[in-house]
Design a protein with these regions (language model features):
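Short, polar N-cap/turn motifs at the start of nucleic acid-interacting alpha helices
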Residues: 157-159, 220-221, 240-261, 265-266, ...
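Conserved tyrosine-mediated DNA breakage-rejoining catalytic core shared by Y-recombinases
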Residues: 142, 151-188, 255
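Short basic/aromatic active-site micro-motif
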Residues: 220-239
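Basic, Lys/Arg- and aromatic-enriched nucleic-acid-binding interface segment
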Residues: 95, 118-146, 150
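C-terminal secondary-structure termini that scaffold catalytic or DNA-interacting sites
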Residues: 1-9, 276-282
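N-terminal core-binding DNA-recognition domain of tyrosine recombinases/integrases
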Residues: 18-32, 38-112
């Protein structure tokens, strides 16, 4: 049973969340974004079953968020969901004061990339079934987000003058092309036409479940996202072209891409040594 289905949500919350999701759909938010946002509100609803969504105060929201030991990125995502929901509720006239309007922004500390090591990936590939093996290979070879991988369809495989590529629909509905090698393309071409990973979410597997399977296969805290870090770091090491990596990952900002690309210690040592060349000869 999914986490969404285990939550107890009262009808007054369900109605409000459903109306809000329609607004998100109208605004062109992706399926993954809508799922994440509504899941956050369902968790809030589950923990406030004796209250209407329009009864909660700023203090209630702050107390609720403070009670959870979330990673900074997760905390920022929850804050964004609350802010979006209550801004909509205020605009619709459900409340006269937006309780999330003055919630403090969440500071994200600068983190080093965490690319999954080759030995971890190789070991996982030797011990998983064919479906999970395909998930890991696609994520490792393309750097796709888990949601993009979960929605992968055979019709997204294309060929141009330079070779095979995948046409990926990313965040905000933006398209990008990811070149792939002939071996992965040949494997995808052997699949029957349709979703690469069939499931119960409009015919395909959910991003959450795909991520769970990959994390379980990799072990030791490695995830689908660390495969994305791995792809970014290796791609950058080949050409040292951060803009190329940005396009491959589908980032709106190159600043985000820099967070994903691991710079080897040897490179930093060479750079530091180069800065001091000739000083002692003077």
């Amino acid at each position: 049973m999914s986490g969404m289905n285990m939550l107890i949500v009262q009808p007054q919350w369900l109605d409000a969340i459903a109306d809000w999701e329609q607004e998100l759909r109208h605004a062109g938010r992706s399926k993954d974004t809508r799922y994440t946002r509504t899941y956050h509100l369902r968790r809030l609803a589950h923990d406030h079953r004796n209250h209407s969504p329009w009864d909660l105060t700023r203090h209630d929201l702050v107390e609720w968020m403070a009670d959870h030991d979330w990673a900074p990125e997760t905390r920022r995502s929850y804050r964004s969901s609350l802010a979006t929901f209550y801004r909509w509720g205020h605009a619709m006239g459900h409340i006269t004061v937006d309780p999330a309007f003055t919630l403090a922004p969440v500071k994200i500390p600068r983190a080093r990339p965490r690319p999954a090591p080759n030995d971890v990936v190789d070991d996982a590939l030797r011990h998983v079934d064919l479906r999970v093996r395909m998930m890991i290979l696609i994520l490792a070879f393309t750097g796709m987000r888990r949601g993009e991988c979960s929605r992968l369809h055979t019709k997204q495989l294309e060929r141009d003058l330079l070779g095979w590529q995948l046409r990926v629909i990313g965040k905000g509905g933006t398209e990008r092309l990811i070149p792939i090698d002939d071996q992965l393309a040949a494997t995808l071409r052997l699949l029957p036409s349709g979703w690469v990973f069939p499931g119960q979410i409009d015919g395909h597997i959910s991003a959450h479940y795909l991520g769970k399977l990959v994390s379980r296969a990799l072990g030791d805290g490695w995830t689908a996202h660390t495969l994305r870090h791995r792809f970014a770091s290796l791609a950058y090491a080949v050409e040292r072209d951060i803009r190329a990596v940005q396009e491959l990952l589908g980032h709106a900002s190159v600043t985000t891409t820099q967070i994903y690309t691991y710079v080897p210690e040897q490179s930093m040592r060479r750079a530091a040594a180069g800065a001091g060349v000739g000083l002692f000869a003077a």
